[in-house]
Design a protein with these regions (language model features):
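N-terminal periplasmic accessory domains that precede
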Residues: 1-2, 7, 19-43, 54-59
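Short sequence motifs at beta-strands and strand-loop junctions characteristic
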Residues: 17, 48-52, 63, 93-97, ...
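Flexible loop and strand-edge segments within Gram-negative outer membrane beta-barrel domains
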Residues: 80-100, 106-108, 112-167, 173-198
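Short loop/turn motifs that connect adjacent beta-strands in outer-membrane beta-barrel proteins
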Residues: 32-36, 64-69, 111-114, 160-166, ...
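Transmembrane beta-strands of outer-membrane beta-barrel pores
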Residues: 43-47, 64-66, 77-81, 121-125, ...
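Outer-membrane beta-barrel transmembrane domain signature of Gram-negative proteins
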Residues: 145-148, 173, 177-179, 186-246
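Membrane-embedded beta-strand positions of outer-membrane beta-barrel proteins
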Residues: 37-41, 71-75, 103-105, 113, ...
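Hydrophobic, lipid-facing positions within transmembrane beta-strands of outer-membrane proteins
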Residues: 23, 37, 43, 54-58, ...
Length: 246
């Protein structure tokens, strides 16, 4: 699935985007070349084996005989019980429940064009503090997060027959829904609700010079649009939402 990872250091470059403060990390994925599948499970004892970390992963790839279309699916399920190292009733490592599922597919519409679509869903639950089997507001100290994340993307690539021109048009979106609790002393006003919708669309054009001045070079240009809508609320005992600035 992953062909290589590129790490570029240093910020302030238009090639990295506005959110890349100290550089960027590019994860270059590869297309599946054959039908395959893998299922794995690991069980890890934490500390004195009073807590266990269970992790199950699954991935599979399907490719047509002419290799014009392919599909890669993946999934993960993880459960780790809370770990209390010094037996004081409070966890040093939180309780975790994670599920991830997604796929990436491609279809080569012609010799020089390709359409790529991907989707992923992540569900995560974290709970730390004490009295993990009780609601968070009944604990002396509790930190609890529950995320539901859905994201996907669509990309169209064109490569010229002489390999000098390359055009990519892409768009992606992700929606995050988070329920949280940060508080102590059985506080009923420490519940929070956060929703976030991020959308991005753009295009990139690359022209390859056989020789520019004294060496081969690439000219890269593009345009990108980003939109991020975040709403963060705290719930009170009266049901009134306090809306901080976002």
């Amino acid at each position: 699935m992953i062909e290589r990872v590129e790490v570029m250091r240093g910020g302030g470059s238009a090639l990295f985007g506005s959110s890349a403060i100290a550089g960027t990390i590019n994860i270059i994925t590869k297309e599946p070349l054959r039908n395959s599948g893998q299922l794995a499970h690991t069980l890890t004892a934490v500390g004195d084996a009073s807590a266990f970390d269970n992790n199950t992963t699954l991935n599979a790839s399907l490719v047509t005989d002419d290799q014009r279309a392919g599909l890669y699916v993946f999934g993960q399920n993880r459960y780790r019980s809370g770990y209390d190292h010094d037996d004081d009733g409070y966890t040093e490592m939180p309780k975790l429940k994670n599920q991830t599922v997604g796929f990436r597919s491609y279809f080569k519409t012609s010799t020089y064009t390709k359409l790529t679509f991907e989707y992923h869903h992540m569900q995560e639950f974290r709970r730390g503090g004490n009295l993990l089997n009780r609601p968070p507001h009944e604990a002396d100290i509790a930190e609890q997060l529950e995320h539901s994340i859905n994201g996907g993307g669509l990309k169209f690539d064109y490569f010229s027959p002489d390999e000098k021109h390359r055009l990519s048009v892409f768009s992606s979106a992700q929606h995050t829904d988070r329920d949280s609790y940060y508080g102590g002393g059985k506080d009923l006003n420490a519940y929070g609700k956060t929703t976030d919708l991020t959308f991005m669309a753009g295009a990139q054009y690359v022209y390859r010079f056989d020789q520019l001045l004294f060496m081969p070079s690439d000219l890269t240009s593009g345009v990108e649009y980003n939109r991020d809508g975040l709403e963060d609320n705290m719930w009170t005992t009266t049901g009134i939402r306090n809306k901080p600035s976002t």
